[in-house]
């Protein structure tokens, strides 16, 4: 059953992240970057300012810093570490180049998503702020496109349940725990006809309980928990990355050369150069979108 599920997910992944969608997403980012006159460069200082200066006043249920931490919580670690490693394994070092490209132009896309989410957000009867793609599709494009908003909601739920919304994070956590405590899978338990390492089961239960305790508190509790955990995650992640870079400075130029050569298939044989470049683009841009853009446009309105 597990192998069948993996095959289905792989087929869906290959279909969705085909070249047409890759080109559409990349050129959308380029178009928005041009129309916004390089927003990600012109307002970099302002963006960094709001990283270190919190705004408690204004509309919404959480502070600006809380919104930032909530947005980053879904990408730091799983997206940046697991996502990058997966992209390199699947597409080679060249995938990193396309990740950088997708991340740069994706900043403009992310800004546009956030702006639309805030512009078309609504206040529910209980006082909570609601917003996201399904709201700005319906309100921005008109009542005739309400079906598209519902379709987005359905597929978004499926992605959240069976894709990057839960599977990636939980798999990353449980795999790390299992590799530390029981890498040889000596201690196992049978569940639903499959054998699982006890450490994986225990880690899964703990993650479920902790996530449940946070989620039942609503967006305010999610924001408060993110404000505590995410800064530690970010500082640790950036610190470790800098340590690795500075302890391997002599290898940095060669690494950049390898990334560029692999990105354009320059090291591949003539017949496979286009194929190597295509794989690097697909894996790099897909993981770049996950690790840099995330899904914060749903949380932005609050």
Predicted feature descriptions by range:
Residues 22-27, 63-71, 143-161, 203-206, ...:
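Select transmembrane alpha-helical segments in multipass membrane proteins
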Residues 46-57, 122-140, 258-264, 276, ...:
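Juxtamembrane inter-helical linkers in multi-pass membrane proteins
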Residues 129, 133, 161-164, 169, ...:
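Loop-to-helix junctions at membrane interfaces in multi-pass transport proteins
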Residues 28, 32-33, 73, 102-127, ...:
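Helix-loop-helix module between adjacent transmembrane segments
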Residues 1-78, 88-95, 106, 246:
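N-terminal alpha-helical transmembrane segments of multi-pass membrane transport
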Residues 24-31, 36-48, 170-177, 199-247, ...:
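Membrane-interface loop-to-helix entry segments
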Residues 17-21, 54-63, 93-94, 142-150, ...:
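Membrane-interfacial loop-to-helix junctions in multi-pass transporters
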Residues 292-302:
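Residue-level detector of conserved catalytic or cofactor/ligand-binding positions
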């Amino acid at each position: 059953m597990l192998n069948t599920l993996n095959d289905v997910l792989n087929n869906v992944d290959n279909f969705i992240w085909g070249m047409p969608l890759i080109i559409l997403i990349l050129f959308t980012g380029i178009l928005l970057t041009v129309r916004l006159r390089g927003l990600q460069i012109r307002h970099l200082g302002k963006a960094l300012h709001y990283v270190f200066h919190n705004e408690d006043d204004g509309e919404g249920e959480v502070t600006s810093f809380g919104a930032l931490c909530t947005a980053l919580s879904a990408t730091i670690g799983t997206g940046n570490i697991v996502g990058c490693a997966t992209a390199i394994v699947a597409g080679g070092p060249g995938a990193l180049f396309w990740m950088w490209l997708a991340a740069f132009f994706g900043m403009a896309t992310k800004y546009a998503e956030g702006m639309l989410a805030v512009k078309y957000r609504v206040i529910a009867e209980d006082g909570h702020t609601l917003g996201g793609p399904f709201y700005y599709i319906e309100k921005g494009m008109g009542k005739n496109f309400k079906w598209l908003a519902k379709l987005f909601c359905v597929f978004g739920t499926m992605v959240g349940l069976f894709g990057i919304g839960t599977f990636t994070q939980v798999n990353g956590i449980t795999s790390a725990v299992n590799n530390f405590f029981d890498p040889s899978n000596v201690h196992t338990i049978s569940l639903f006809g499959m054998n699982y390492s006890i450490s994986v089961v225990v880690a899964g239960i703990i993650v479920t309980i902790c996530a449940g305790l946070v989620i039942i508190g609503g967006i305010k509790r999610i924001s408060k928990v993110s404000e505590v955990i995410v800064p530690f995650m970010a500082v640790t992640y950036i610190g470790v990355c800098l340590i690795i870079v500075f302890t391997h400075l002599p290898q940095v130029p060669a690494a950049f050369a390898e990334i560029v050569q692999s990105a354009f298939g320059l090291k591949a044989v003539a017949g496979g150069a286009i194929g190597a470049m295509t794989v690097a683009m697909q894996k790099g841009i897909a993981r770049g979108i996950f690790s840099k853009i995330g899904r914060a446009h749903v949380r932005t309105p609050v």
